[in-house]
Amino acid sequence: MVNPDGVIHGNTRAELTGIDPNRVWKKTSKNVTPSIHHIKKQIQKTKEETCLILDLHSHSKKLGCFFYGNYSQSDVKSFRLFPSTVCQEDIRFCYKNCRFRGGNDSSARKALFNELGIPNIFTV
């Protein structure tokens, strides 16, 4: 868990510092966002062996289980294969609620995809 201090104090998104840890992945700081900085460094070290990253979240308005994924016009099927398979195998996941778009450039999903080229990064 990346944000236990914020959650313990009732924050759903922000750490005690007031920073949303899912909006700093594009430019991390060892001093300001140490947890994200070190997680990102570990992912960078193992990017060749990494085939899937799941960024687990709750949603403030949407109910149920679904995926948010990245988008590639040249390879639509492979970007949707994992979510499609999970949705077929587990009735708790609903494919019609999944979204495959660009997203926020500073989110883990988008920043790691842009920097490392790992296609299978999903917010769940």
PLM regions with names:
Residues 1-123:
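Structured catalytic-domain cores with a bias toward divalent-metal coordination
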